[in-house]
Each structure stands twice: as structure tokens, then as C-alpha cells.
């Protein structure tokens, strides 16, 4: 029998009734002759509630203890789902990440999966069990519990699918697939039947929150198809895979946006080797992730350097960058947190002229000023004022007549 891995998000298991609904769906897959491994997230807002609870105890929780605490959310969901499945007549067993053989490195709160020892899961499947695995977690060689970071249950599911040789990983959530744009912003946005790994990775990185980028990278590496569908209806969803037939057809595949953008500009710094490194190395050591970087052409060997970070890191980034800017003799350093970004994505854009020009012209025609630009072979991203982002999404979706 083929193995199917299903992953249910927090909204799908948020209440007892929803857990019972998931149990019924899992049972139907089992009845179809598949061996099934189910990965679950914590119920609803459990993870956020646990973080708040820790904050009431201490302002500086130890990373190891936080991982132990946060891992309990998925344990609750997995055990309740196993109970619900047993209650309707199936054999089921819940496993923690450790019991499932998920081994990680020692980077608490953002651990990476090193390997998965699949013997326990395979043994349980051979016994006719439906295996429920707590997502988002693993264990180190020293038997310490770790968590995989936000969205880590997606990573758990895809990694398990790869290790088990599953035929597919199904990501069941409160949305019924990947859309040409956010349907809450663009009412006539449509669901995509399929999308390539490369396109999906760009969308996930630049604003589409349905799947985590790490999970997409893993899926592409091990060629694991992912079906994104709703846990509340039977719509077929969107298949994420490596189908080469899509490359020629898709021009602009989807429009994505992200409101979590802040900008720092270091003005009037010397334009010479080592200046950028003197700024970005300390930022990296402080755990600050930098996205778009732009340096203007120098005048009299003086230039301005601008980069973006997430809004929650702007204060820490300024704290790190200010003394460096002063040491470099910068004329000023300024921050702007009222920004967002909008991106167009599609493999058909590769080596095809005109997309950037059309995007910029569309934004200009709608009175939207572009602050920064970044690109890849299949993506163009513009940093703009936060208040204009949704207008930009609607305008671009219409201008490019985004294709099915």
C-alpha cells in the first residue's frame, strides 16, 4: 500500500468538533486503501497563548525550556485526534516528534531536521495503525526537545513524506488552494489547479502564507508533490509539483504581497570595499535577516545604502546599525516602518522582456511610488507604501490578466 502524509493546520483542529471532522476525513483516506501518517499543528492560537504565558513568568525565557513548552501544543492536538479516530472505529496511535524519530540539530526555536529514523512509524503502519505525529518538533542527540520555528509543522510533514517515500503530502487547511492573488483583496482571484515548486517558493517567500518556504524547498529537493486543499470541503485544491509543462505557459502566475516590511537607509557613507560587510556582518550576528539591499551610484566616492528587514526587527536593527553608521562617518541613518511589498511571479517571465516595464507603468498609473525593487528570474518585487499595497495587488492582477 502507498503511504500518504496529511498535515492539518491549527485552524483545522481548533476545536473538538473540528478534530472530529478531521478524524472522519482521515478515516475515508484509510478506507481507500492507503497507509496514512497525519501531522498536526497546535490547536488554534495555542502556540501564541503559550508564548504569552511564558512572558508572564519571565521576560527572558530560556530557549530550551521554551521549546519544551511550545512542543506541548502539538502533543495535545495529536493525542486528541488519535482519540477521535479510535472513537469511530479505527486503530490509531499518537507519536511525539521524538517518538517518530525526527532528529534535529541543537538550534532551539529554529532547529533543522538532520534525519528521520522511520522504523517506529513503519512498524505502526504495518500493524494497521493510523499514525498521528506531533508537528513542529524533534529531538537532539542529547534527547532535548527542539522546535522548528513558525510553520514548522509544514516542514515536519514534507520531511516525513520524503523519509517514508510517500506518494504525496497533503496540506489541509482553512483555504482550498493557492490563488492568483489573495481573494480577500481581489474578489475575482481564482484557485490554481497546479503550480511549480519554483513559483511556489517565490510566492511563499514574498507573501503567500499558505506554505512555508522551508517546506517547499524540501519538497523540491526530494520531489514530493504537495496538494494544498481545504479540510472543510472536498475541492481538489492546488497541486504543487515539478511539472515542466507549466514553464512555457505561465506568464504571471500570481500576485503576492507582504505588509511586514521596514526600511533602513544609511546616508553618506564612503563607497569603498568592506563598508557593506561592516554593516551586514554585525546584523547577521544579531540574528537580523536582511532582504532587499540597494546602494546608489556614488558621487565623489560617497553613497547611500538602503536595506529592508521585518517590522519586528527594525528596532534591533537600528540599535546595531546606528553606532556602525556613526563610526563610518555617515551623514544620517533613517528608518521607515510604513512599507509593504508587492510581487508578480511566473516562470514564463524568465528571459521575456516587458514585464518590469508593465509593472512599473501600472503602479505609476495608479499613483503608487516605488521605493525599492528586487528581482529574480521569475519574480519582480516592488517596495511601496503600506497604505498602497492592496491597491497595487488589485491593479497588477487586472493589468497582467493573471493566467489559469
Q: In which residue ranges do the predicted regions lie?
A:
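A conserved regulatory-domain signal marking ACT and ACT-like small-molecule sensing domains
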Residues: 237-404
